[in-house]
């Protein structure tokens, strides 16, 4: 168990230096405009909604999962110049904890502090099918989540709902899912004072397809590609699961 937790901690620590040096939220105040705010909000919704699930199977009563997760947006959408005119890769890591509850429910919380943005939230997962580990069986679940974030130049509230299905195989479990992200963003600081207090509301679709691996020492690994407002992106999770 100690070894598994150490691996998880090191994986999260190793992800921290991945921050793109020229693509920071601190550039928001100098570059945000009334024209690019909507695209920025849509891209943030897709990024924050990524990585909510890594299989279609709920944990089940008494189950537990602690994971380090990350999502990547290779470049923003064309209209999103709110962090600068030159597109750069953007990462968002976080810690997510999940616990199995009665009535085919899982509860989870997630949190991060990254590039000046502090974000926290949580949600529920409901298994449409009962959790089983039978080979070549399908598992399906629905997830809902809410989270809020604060940066010195903007604040946001994000909600999403997803449906995911996975197929149990001997070594790997493929999964596909889709959902909707609803994001509200408020400008808190901008060089153009007329923008302060401006709010943007967006609703965008998102889809993902990935692979989940059960490794020795209770290690749970998943990698996936996703598609959101910004185009194709990626997400990954490394955790300890019981």
Residue ranges and their predicted role:
Residues 20-133:
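Transmembrane beta-barrel domains of Gram-negative outer membranes and organellar outer membranes
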Residues 55, 95-101, 122-126, 161-167, ...:
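Residues on the lipid-exposed face of transmembrane beta-strands in outer-membrane beta-barrel proteins
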Residues 71-79, 112-116, 129-131, 145-153, ...:
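Sequence/structural signature of outer-membrane beta-barrel proteins
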Residues 7-15:
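Bacterial N-terminal signal peptides
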Residues 87-92, 108-122, 150-156, 201, ...:
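Solvent-exposed loop/turn segments connecting transmembrane beta-strands
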